[in-house]
């Protein structure tokens, strides 16, 4: 285990504030920023390093630890995993964490620390800084420059070791204005495989209470307000920036699920969205009996949690100035299942577009027909298909279907596959019956990847696969190719009417 010495040139107060370590000079806080209040993880009265405990301010602290030292070899420190601290009594400890093996270790080998201190003094007196090809004389001239450089190194260390972005605000002594986010105890989580991490100690006089941490699922829930974990590469994406990235993983480019509100914002010009039938709600038409939760109560619960009235939002707006009618399904509302209200809203949308002669976009994300409404939900397939037939074949208008993940069941068997142009998102799960249903029904194994968009594309099931970034531009070009133009280019015609319908 390599250990690097820290120099006390750093100001305690500035170190605490700028690294977000603590609010007092007597405490050493975390390299991290989380939420909530949890049980203590470590207790050690002998070393006077008391419990690591979560606080409402988003930091945890170890009382009576005085400060980090400094670094003798700053470039070697970046890839190291051990830090040395000294408590208020002048006693030194080495703090080690192994991210890969999820180990947190504290040691107080006094002989080793004394040897290091002697080596460090010799290092400075011999002028080793001049031999370092990375050394910048100005960098070490002032305490302020040291702090800035140390901040940069801590940031680089976390980026390289934890594989996530961290953010450090320098030049401010205000604790609330400076922060650093990291995820010390977990890195790449592999799907359903759950591993438990532990905290252990070394040293003859150590008396720590070791508590095994929760599994990956619980840990990810705890940090869910800060990070979004990619379903494909399991890397973490900072939640505050994730929406601006269109829910696309910055590491691997995987398209994660997107709610209907974000999709509307992505596709529709700002200030042009006008919802339709947003007050229409389900009324439990067959009085579905459930041992767990009544259907109406379940609907109410989803309405409170999502802010939606049903699993689809319909309305009119403009896409790059072109008037359109659009329906966007939301998988967060009962899995985007299609009930009588969903079918009615989509049917009314298509009928409105037929009367106004404007193009229709349907963004599909659904698990299929809603079982709580029985055959009434299956009837919606025929009702929507009938309205679509009149719109497409009789009126010669243009319908675009966008298949997102997942699109299955009755939606796949009806309006999802009826578009004049059928667009799929990359790696979207598109099928009629899900993998589990097929395997349990036919007792056969469904090959991996046989129900993703790329496989179906090569079989000719739909037209292009379009990522979210260029989607709006692609739709705009398709509409203009089929005779629909922005209002300012088609002032002589009615709202985006077809100029060339044949």
Curated annotation (Swiss-Prot):
> Any one Gene Ontology biological process term?
fatty acid biosynthetic process
List cellular component terms (GO): acetyl-CoA carboxylase complex; chloroplast stroma
- Cellular localisation: Plastid, Chloroplast stroma
Q: Which residues form the CoA carboxyltransferase N-terminal domain?
A: 226-497
Query: Which regions are flagged for Low complexity bias?
Result: 191-202
Q: What is its main location?
A: plastid
Cell wall biogenesis/degradation among the record's keywords? no
Q: Which reaction does it catalyse?
A: N(6)-carboxybiotinyl-L-lysyl-[protein] + acetyl-CoA = N(6)-biotinyl-L-lysyl-[protein] + malonyl-CoA
Where does this protein hold Zn(2+)?
Answer: 230, 233, 249, 252
Highest taxon of source: Eukaryota
| Enzyme Commission designation | 2.1.3.15
Cofactor entry: Zn(2+)
Q: Which GO terms describe its molecular function?
A: acetyl-CoA carboxylase activity; ATP binding; carboxyl- or carbamoyltransferase activity; zinc ion binding
Note the zinc finger regions (C4-type) by start and end residue.
230-252
The segments labelled Disordered in the record are 191-212
Family listed:
Belongs to the AccD/PCCB family.
Q: Which PANTHER family match?
A: ACETYL-COENZYME A CARBOXYLASE CARBOXYL TRANSFERASE SUBUNIT BETA, CHLOROPLASTIC
The job of this chain, per UniProt, is described as: Component of the acetyl coenzyme A carboxylase (ACC) complex. Biotin carboxylase (BC) catalyzes the carboxylation of biotin on its carrier protein (BCCP) and then the CO(2) group is transferred by the transcarboxylase to acetyl-CoA to form malonyl-CoA.
The record's note on quaternary structure and interaction partners says: Acetyl-CoA carboxylase is a heterohexamer composed of biotin carboxyl carrier protein, biotin carboxylase and 2 subunits each of ACCase subunit alpha and ACCase plastid-coded subunit beta (accD).
The protein's name: Acetyl-coenzyme A carboxylase carboxyl transferase subunit beta, chloroplastic
């Amino acid at each position: 285990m390599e250990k690097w010495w820290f120099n006390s040139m750093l100001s305690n107060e500035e170190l605490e504030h700028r690294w977000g370590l603590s609010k007092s000079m007597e405490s050493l806080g975390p390299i991290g920023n989380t939420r909530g209040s949890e049980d203590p993880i470590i207790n050690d009265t002998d070393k006077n390093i008391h419990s690591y405990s979560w606080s409402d301010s988003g930091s945890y602290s170890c009382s009576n630890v005085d400060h980090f030292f400094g670094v003798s070899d700053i470039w070697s420190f970046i890839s190291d995993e051990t830090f040395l601290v000294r408590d208020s009594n002048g006693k030194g400890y080495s703090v080690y964490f192994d991210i890969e093996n999820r180990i947190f270790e504290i040691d107080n080998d006094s002989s080793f620390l004394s040897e290091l201190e002697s080596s460090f003094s010799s290092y400075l007196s011999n002028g080793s800084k001049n031999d370092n090809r990375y050394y910048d004389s100005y960098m070490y001239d002032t305490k302020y420059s040291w702090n800035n450089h140390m901040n940069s190194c801590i940031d680089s260390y976390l980026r390289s070791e934890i594989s996530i972005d961290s953010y450090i605000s320098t030049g401010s002594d205000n604790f609330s204005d400076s922060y650093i986010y990291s995820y010390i105890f977990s890195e790449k989580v592999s799907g359903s495989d759950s591993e438990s991490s532990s905290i252990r100690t070394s040293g003859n006089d150590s008396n720590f209470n070791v508590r095994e941490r929760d599994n990956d699922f619980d840990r990810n829930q705890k940090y869910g307000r800060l990070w979004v974990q990619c379903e494909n590469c399991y890397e973490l994406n900072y939640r505050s920036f994730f929406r601006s990235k269109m829910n696309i993983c910055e590491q691997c480019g995987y398209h994660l699920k997107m709610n209907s509100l974000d999709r509307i914002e992505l596709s529709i010009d700002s200030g042009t969205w006008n919802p339709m039938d947003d007050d229409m709600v389900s009324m439990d038409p067959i009085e579905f009996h459930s041992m767990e939760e009544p259907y109406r109560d379940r609907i109410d619960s989803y309405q409170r949690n999502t802010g939606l009235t049903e699993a689809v939002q319909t309305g009119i707006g403009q896409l790059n100035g072109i008037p359109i009618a659009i329906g966007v399904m939301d998988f967060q509302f009962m899995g985007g299942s299609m009930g009588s209200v969903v079918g009615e809203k989509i049917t009314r949308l298509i009928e409105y577009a037929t009367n106004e002669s404007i193009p229709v976009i349907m963004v599909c994300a659904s698990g299929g027909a809603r079982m709580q409404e029985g055959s009434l939900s299956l009837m919606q397939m025929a009702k929507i298909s009938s309205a679509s037939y009149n719109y497409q074949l009789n009126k010669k208008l243009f319908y675009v279907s966008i298949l997102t993940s997942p699109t299955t069941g009755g939606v796949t068997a009806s309006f999802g596959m009826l578009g004049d142009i059928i667009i799929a998102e990359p790696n979207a799960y598109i099928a009629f019956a899900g993998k589990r249903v097929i395997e349990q029904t036919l007792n056969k194994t469904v090959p991996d990847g046989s129900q993703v968009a790329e496989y179906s594309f090569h079989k000719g099931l739909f037209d292009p696969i379009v990522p979210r970034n260029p989607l709006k531009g692609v739709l705009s070009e398709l509409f203009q190719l089929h005779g629909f133009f922005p209002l300012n280019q088609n002032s002589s015609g009615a709202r985006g009417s077809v100029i060339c319908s044949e």
